[in-house]
């Protein structure tokens, strides 16, 4: 894993190439959450892209073209347009931003002579061929720029036209500040970390994190497994989790993982009690029970107070902490205590804390602890693939130092 991260660290950064009087296309990640009125509820990803954009402004780039996706549109969907982002961008950058409906319109605007201009292209996923990595679309985007900058870590594990494809055909292709910060932070967490190194994994499914868990056992010292995925491990150990969500097909995998952890001397911690309910969506009866005594027909929705105490003690002894995935159904206030408590606990330590996953970041924001974590990754799937020991495809096509 470290060798692959080192390979990705060898990618050239925007500071290593000339951007003055150049046309720069930056693949940013503005895939931010919106409320029902299409207002941005968390602009973290937009703010994280600002240093790269500002660097181009300060170094007098001729034109700056911002390309991003938003959501998963099926064709053109007005509710997923990037046009409403203009005012937020202009306020954050203190600079005019021109919206381009499509590439043809953008090309026409680029032919006009003017001082540094910033263009925001409409949601790239409105264009057919983006997610299929269409070569013609990639060449079209590459033709717009002298320098291509990938600053969208969250999509770097996907071979899409605006990330992987454009980089293949652009004359110069480098990473932005955010991409560099992401890789450097992950490398810091694993390259001679202060030990014990603790990994906390939560979320709904074992299947989504099984590869990660198998690959990371050689690098960690302690492992907390919580969230709905812990139900499968509890059942594998013989506990009756009643109506809780379980991936029965992965029972043997769970047992093999626990055995492997034991052989590698990785201490594994599972919940010892739980907050349960008869109905997670409309809870009428909520109970706290030891995991060996779950109420019939109840579902586990959060970790209980005894688990909180146990996990707190583990966290207090760990100078390096990685966390990916909530500990319960944190979207509902009744079952958010475990995840919120964990966020506060990690924030109160002196540990180097690296946080990944959209649900985890959302929980940390709700807890008001965003500024008290060492590093919060903007990538969900990309973070997982990195931890699984994979080289993210978009790094392969960027220019290397040697």
Swiss-Prot record:
Its main location: cytoplasm. It comes from the Bacteria. It catalyses: (2R)-3-phosphoglycerate + ATP = (2R)-3-phospho-glyceroyl phosphate + ADP. ATP binds at residues 209, 331, 357-360. GO terms for biological process: gluconeogenesis; glycolytic process. GO terms for molecular function: ADP binding; ATP binding; phosphoglycerate kinase activity. Signal peptide: none annotated. Pathway: Carbohydrate degradation; glycolysis; pyruvate from D-glyceraldehyde 3-phosphate: step 2/5. Keywords: ATP-binding, Cytoplasm, Glycolysis, Kinase, Nucleotide-binding, Transferase. Its EC number is 2.7.2.3. GO terms for cellular component: cytosol. The keyword Nucleotide-binding applies. Disulfide bonds: none annotated. HAMAP family: Phosphoglyc_kinase. Belongs to the phosphoglycerate kinase family. This is Phosphoglycerate kinase.
């Amino acid at each position: 894993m470290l060798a692959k991260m080192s390979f990705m660290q060898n990618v050239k950064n925007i500071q290593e190439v000339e951007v003055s009087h150049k046309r720069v296309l930056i693949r940013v990640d503005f895939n931010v959450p919106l409320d029902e009125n299409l207002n941005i509820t968390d602009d973290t990803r937009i703010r994280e892209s600002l240093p790269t954009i500002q660097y181009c402004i300060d170094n007098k780039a001729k034109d700056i073209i911002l390309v991003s996706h938003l959501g998963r549109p099926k064709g053109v969907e007005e509710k997923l347009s990037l046009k409403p982002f203009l005012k937020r961008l202009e306020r954050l950058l203190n600079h005019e931003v021109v919206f381009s409906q499509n590439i043809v319109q953008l090309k026409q605007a680029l032919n006009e002579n003017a001082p540094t201009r910033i263009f925001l292209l409409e949601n790239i996923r409105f264009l057919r061929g983006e997610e299929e990595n269409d070569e013609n679309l990639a060449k079209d985007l590459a033709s717009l720029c002298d320098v291509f900058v990938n600053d969208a870590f969250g999509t770097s594990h996907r071979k899409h036209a605006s990330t992987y494809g454009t980089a293949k055909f652009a004359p110069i292709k480098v990473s932005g500040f955010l991409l560099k910060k992401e890789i450097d932070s992950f490398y810091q967490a694993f390259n001679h970390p202060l030990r014990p190194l603790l990994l906390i994994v939560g979320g709904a499914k074992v299947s989504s994190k099984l590869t990660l868990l198998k690959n990371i056992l050689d690098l960690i010292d302690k492992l907390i497994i919580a969230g709905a995925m812990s139900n499968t491990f509890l059942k594998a150990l013989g506990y009756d989790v009643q109506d809780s969500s379980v991936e029965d097909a992965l029972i043997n995998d769970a047992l093999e993982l626990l055995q492997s952890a034991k052989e590698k001397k990785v201490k594994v911690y599972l919940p010892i009690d739980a907050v349960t309910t008869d109905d997670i969506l409309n809870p009428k009866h909520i109970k706290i029970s030891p995991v060996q005594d779950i109420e019939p027909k109840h579902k586990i929705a959060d970790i209980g107070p005894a688990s909180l105490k146990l996990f707190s003690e583990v966290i207090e002894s760990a100078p390096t902490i990685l966390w990916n995935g909530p500990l319960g159904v944190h979207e509902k206030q009744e079952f958010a205590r475990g995840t919120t408590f964990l966020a506060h606990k990690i924030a109160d330590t002196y540990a180097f804390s690296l946080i990944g996953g959209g649900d985890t970041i959302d929980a940390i924001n709700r807890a008001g602890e965003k500024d008290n974590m060492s590093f919060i990754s903007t990538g969900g799937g990309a973070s997982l693939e990195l931890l699984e020991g994979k080289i993210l495809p978009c790094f392969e096509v960027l220019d290397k130092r040697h």
